[in-house]
């Protein structure tokens, strides 16, 4: 695949993720948009690692690290959302201010 195609796809995924993160009012949707952003970053890391330094796997290793962080976020995020839902009876971001009683 050509470099331009991967970069356009990655920019498209990143833009969708940023737009969804800014406009979403639901916590689950915000977590999904955050995953889109992380996947776009991983695509760029692997692409540029292959393009500039194909013998050393620094970009690939760093993308595996980002995938591990995303897996931890995917495990902890829904647990936090369900805990907030149990206490506040809502998953809307603007209604879940935990600093107020």
UniProtKB/Swiss-Prot annotation:
GO cellular component, one term: chloroplast thylakoid membrane
Membrane-spanning residues: 2-22, 32-52, 61-81
Membrane-related topology note: Multi-pass membrane protein
Keyword Membrane recorded: yes
Record's catalysed reaction(s): a plastoquinone + NADH + (n+1) H(+)(in) = a plastoquinol + NAD(+) + n H(+)(out); a plastoquinone + NADPH + (n+1) H(+)(in) = a plastoquinol + NADP(+) + n H(+)(out)
Location, primary (coarse class): plastid
Keyword check for Transport: yes
MF terms (GO), sorted A to Z: oxidoreductase activity, acting on NAD(P)H, quinone or similar compound as acceptor; quinone binding
Annotated GO biological process: ATP synthesis coupled electron transport; photosynthesis, light reaction
Subunit structure: NDH is composed of at least 16 different subunits, 5 of which are encoded in the nucleus.
Protein's job: NDH shuttles electrons from NAD(P)H:plastoquinone, via FMN and iron-sulfur (Fe-S) centers, to quinones in the photosynthetic chain and possibly in a chloroplast respiratory chain. The immediate electron acceptor for the enzyme in this species is believed to be plastoquinone. Couples the redox reaction to proton translocation, and thus conserves the redox energy in a proton gradient.
Family assignment from sequence similarity: Belongs to the complex I subunit 4L family.
Entry protein name: NAD(P)H-quinone oxidoreductase subunit 4L, chloroplastic
